[in-house]
């Protein structure tokens, strides 16, 4: 029950026509229902892609995808995922095109109770971790058993303690090096 504003498709189509390097174009969203407000998502390619390391920065219901990118690279949603299909697709598209979000709320996104049920959150976390692992490997990072735990602690705001500070620093240095090599 999301609601597109009448001019959404026109604005996104025009933007993609003017920017042929953009393969994925989303928009800011207006939250309605349980929460209200504007989700001001990153608008620039580099920042959107960096945010893929921490969470998604594309509102899937607002996204327009360039069909040619999907066809050229034989990309599609994976049936392996039930709640992280979009995140997985963004990771697959990561190397093949640029991403953008239009800086205006062109979709009204309803937030409801069932989205935050324990089962959905756990499933989202498990599937999200699998996709995140694929992204980190794609970036050239050699993962060890504690890396994903450290990554999630850092980027979820849980934080780290003095016992894990050396491992955390080592992980962040390796992550930065992988990112520099990948560029």
Feature-to-residue mapping (PLM):
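Generic alpha-helical structural signal
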Residues: 10, 126-130, 173
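Conserved nucleotide-sugar donor-binding catalytic segment
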Residues: 27, 41-147, 155
